[in-house]
């Protein structure tokens, strides 16, 4: 069930003012405590505008990949990851992770109409015959692939930094 911005804001403010706990506040406003918890996280991370979900959002392949890599590389819950990236539902993140595990970064590149298409590796031969739409799709694919590689490199570097930090701490002890 969708709730208005006003109801969300009133429930969050009621809880944050200390009038009641999450479960009591959820009962008072007749909503689920998980939704309220998510709204509180959104509000605390992004302010009141994050509670206004009137517009259907679309996310770039780079954004999706960034969220998935963050979720897989950190031990935060999916609702917390969704709140961190201002995504209205943790199920969106869950679906992105499923797609990523099934198809890798290509899960985010394909549009619904393009799902049956396969990417050709002999692009140099086909470049002269490509339509502008195919060129745009190729560019989108290469950008997403580049973003994926950069994100993966950053993820691996961060992991390496953490390992080095652990070694330093254990050698000092």
Swiss-Prot record:
GO terms for molecular function: sequence-specific DNA binding. The keyword tRNA-binding does not apply. Signal peptide: none annotated. SUPFAM superfamilies: Homeodomain-like, TrpR-like. Keywords: Transposable element. Residues 115-135 are annotated as: Disordered. Belongs to the IS150/IS1296 orfA family. This is Insertion element IS1397 uncharacterized 20.1 kDa protein.
């Amino acid at each position: 069930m969708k709730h208005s911005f006003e109801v969300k804001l009133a429930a969050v403010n009621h809880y944050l003012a200390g009038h009641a706990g999450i479960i009591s506040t959820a009962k008072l406003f007749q909503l689920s405590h998980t939704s309220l918890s998510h709204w509180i996280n959104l509000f605390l991370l992004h302010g009141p505008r994050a509670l206004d979900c009137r517009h259907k959002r679309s996310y770039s392949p780079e954004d999706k990949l960034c969220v998935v890599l963050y979720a897989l590389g950190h031990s935060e819950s999916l609702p917390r990851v969704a709140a961190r990236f201002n995504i209205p539902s943790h199920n969106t993140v869950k679906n992105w992770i499923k797609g990523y595990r099934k198809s890798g970064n290509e899960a985010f590149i394909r549009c619904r109409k393009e799902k049956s298409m396969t990417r050709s590796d002999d692009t140099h031969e086909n470049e002269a015959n490509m339509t502008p739409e195919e060129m745009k799709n190729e560019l989108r694919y290469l950008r997403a692939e580049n973003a994926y590689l950069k994100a993966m490199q950053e993820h691996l570097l961060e992991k390496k930094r953490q390992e080095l930090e652990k070694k330093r701490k254990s050698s000092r002890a």
